[in-house]
Amino acid sequence: MAIAWMDSYTRWAADFRGEHLRSWMRDHTEVPAVAVVLYLILVLYVPENVMAHRNPIKLRFLNMLWNLLLTVFSICGAYYCLPRLWEVLTSPRISGLMADPNLGPNAPPPKLPGSFYNSACAWNDKIFFDGFVGLWVAAFVLSKIPEMIDTVFLVFQKKPVIFLHWYHHATVMLFCWHAYAYTISSGLWFATMNYCVHSIMYFYYFMCACGMRKVIRPIAPLITMMQILQMVAGTLIVLYTYVKKQFMGEFCAVNNPSLRMGLLMYVSYLFLFSQLYYRSYISPAAARTLRMANGEKKGK
C-alpha cells in the first residue's frame, strides 16, 4: 500500500503545474480575505468574549501532534527546495527548463546559468513552479492558512498571543497568496528559508509540548536569531529585485505591488523579531529573569 501511495505521489508531483493553481488563486481572492477576517475574530474577540470566564482547554496531545506534523512538513519542503535553490545559484546550467512556446514546438530550452540574479529575477515555470519543487512551493503558500491553527492552540489554552505572532501569521498569508497569484521570481528563496527555519522552530515547539521545555530552552535564542537572519536575507533580496527592476531597468519577474508589500513586510518583521530578541534575551528585565531562574535551579 505504501509503495502504491508513493507511486501515485511521484506521478502527481511530477505532473504538477503551478499555472492551474495560480489561475484558481487569482479567481478566489475572497479565500485569504475571509481567512484573515476569521483569524482576527479569533485573536481580538474570542479571548475576551468567549474564553474570559472559561478554563483553559487541555490540548497538549493535539498540540504535540500538530507541531510534529509541521516539523515533518517543513523538513520535506526543505528537502525539495534547498537543493533546487543551490542549483539555481551555482549550476553552470539550470536543469529541466521549459522552452518558450512562442518560439515554436521545436524550440530548445533556454541555457540559463546559475547565479544570484537568476535565483532572484529569472522566470521559467520549471525553476520552481512545476514538478516536485513546484508542488512544495505551492504547499508552502497554501500552508499559511492552516498554520493559523498555531493561534487556535494559544487562544483556547488561554496563553498570550503577542502582536508579532498574529501580525506575522496574517500578513505572511496575504502576501504569499498575492505573490504566488501574480508571479514572484524570488519565491524559491522565501519558501526555502521559511521551510529551513520552520523545521527547527516547530521541532522546538514539539519538544516543548512534550514537556521538555527546560531541556531545550537554551536553543530558543538561536531560533529567534535564525528568524532575524531570515528577515535580513528577505529584506536584502526584495531590495535587490527592487533596485534591479526600478533603478537599473533590468528584467525581474515580480510585480510592483509585491515588491512594495514584500519590503514593508520584511522590514516590519525584522524590527519586531529584533525587538523580541532584545526583550527576551538582552534587556535588563530578561537578565533578571535569567538570574532568578538560575537561582531557583541552584536552590533546588
Swiss-Prot record:
| Motif placement: HxxHH motif | 165-169
Its keywords, alphabetically, are: Endoplasmic reticulum, Fatty acid biosynthesis, Fatty acid metabolism, Lipid biosynthesis, Lipid metabolism, Membrane, Transferase, Transmembrane, Transmembrane helix
Membrane topology value: Multi-pass membrane protein
Q: Offer an example of a GO molecular function term for this protein.
A: fatty acid elongase activity
Mind telling me which residue stretches traverse the membrane in this protein?
A: 31-51, 61-81, 127-147, 170-190, 192-212, 219-239, 261-283
**Biological pathway:** Lipid metabolism; fatty acid biosynthesis
Q: What class of enzyme is it?
A: transferase
Its EC number is 2.3.1.-
Which InterPro entries does the UniProt record give? ELO_CS, ELO_fam
Q: Which GO BP terms, alphabetically?
A: fatty acid elongation, monounsaturated fatty acid; fatty acid elongation, polyunsaturated fatty acid; fatty acid elongation, saturated fatty acid; sphingolipid biosynthetic process; very long-chain fatty acid biosynthetic process
Q: Out of the domains of life, which is the source?
A: Eukaryota
* Protein location: Endoplasmic reticulum membrane
Q: Which GO terms describe its cellular component?
A: endoplasmic reticulum membrane
Mention any Pfam family matching this sequence: ELO
Q: Which PANTHER family match?
A: ELONGATION OF VERY LONG CHAIN FATTY ACIDS PROTEIN 6 (PTHR11157:SF17), FATTY ACID ACYL TRANSFERASE-RELATED (PTHR11157)
Name under which the protein is recorded: Fatty acid elongase 3
- Specify the species: Trypanosoma cruzi (strain CL Brener)
